[in-house]
Each structure stands twice: as C-alpha cells, then as structure tokens.
Amino acid sequence: QWRRSLDLQTPPQHTLLSCFGGLHLPLTTPAAEVGHGQWTLLCFGNSFPKTAAIKPLQPPWQPQQLMPLCSRVLTKPGFSTICEALGHGCGVILVERQGFAEAAALQSGVQRHGFHRLISPNQLQVGDWHLSDPLLPPHQGPLDRTGAQTASHHLAQVLMAGVN
C-alpha cells in the first residue's frame, strides 16, 4: 500500500533510502543508476534535482517506515539508522565519516554484520554509489534480527519471577 501511495515504479531491490539525519548534506548529484531510472531514491529534503526516480519525502514519513520498501539505505555512521536498516534486512551504503567518535566502531560493525559498501564523502557527492555492484557480504555474518524480542521476553520472565 505504501509503495502505491509513493508511486514507486521500481521493485524493492532497486529502491534506495537516503538517510542523513541532522547532517544536512547538500547532495545534488544522484548516482547514474538513479538518473537513468534503474533505481528509485527516497530522500528527505529537497537537495536532489526533481526527477521521476527521486522521491522527496516530508513528515510524517519516518525512515523506519520506508526501510521495508527498500533493499539499501544510504547513510552516515549513525547508530539508530544502522540498527534499523540491519533490523529490516537492508544493505547499507555507508559514507565514511571522520571526526565522529563512534564512526569507526559503527563502520566496523556494519562490515562485520551487514551487507555493505563504504564510500567516501567525495563518492557521495559525485554520485559514485556503486548501485550496480552487489554489496559486500558481512565478514562475520548477520546479527540475530529478533534481539529486541528476545530481550523483551527475557525481561518479562525476570519480572514475572520476581512477582512470584
């Protein structure tokens, strides 16, 4: 239903979500595959040129609502977005970031546990996103995507044991 309301013409495996949170990067050049209509880019804000393959989004849309519609998420190293993307089974195209305390740990975690591709800020700006290339596989395998449910179940058991 959401695919219809957004008028998405490409299948999920050719739909990309761009999430940069508060970084507000002035992106003007999408990947060639987006420009040629092979991929659809869902993005927040209006920094990209308006084309049929670029869907600018406004609130109330949230990134986690859109991830099930996509195969890949283009993002900076940010804990919440990476967790949501991996939790939804999305591959991550991660823009390398210097000067951010958690960046190295998040980049390493994505490489260990998610299908991924690291790109430089320059590659981001010139549209060199490697969308036609398969993502690199995780070095150690994916994380358990039911971790939140497992933790909630365990917490409920502990609390119930305390009541009895």
Segments predicted by a language model, with ranges:
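Donor-nucleotide binding loops and adjacent catalytic segments primarily
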Residues: 1-72
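Short catalytic-loop micro-motif centered on adjacent basic/acidic residues
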Residues: 16-19, 93-95, 142
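Short Gly/Pro-enriched loop/turn and capping motifs at secondary-structure junctions
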Residues: 23-25, 48-49, 80-81, 99-101, ...
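Anion (oxyanion) recognition and catalysis
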Residues: 35, 86, 111-112
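Residues that cap or flank secondary-structure elements
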Residues: 54-55, 73, 98, 143
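Nucleotide-sugar donor-binding patch of glycosyltransferase catalytic domains
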Residues: 56, 91-130, 134-135
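A donor-sugar binding/catalytic signature common to diverse glycosyltransferases
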Residues: 62-105
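C-terminal amphipathic helix plus adjacent low-complexity
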Residues: 128-164
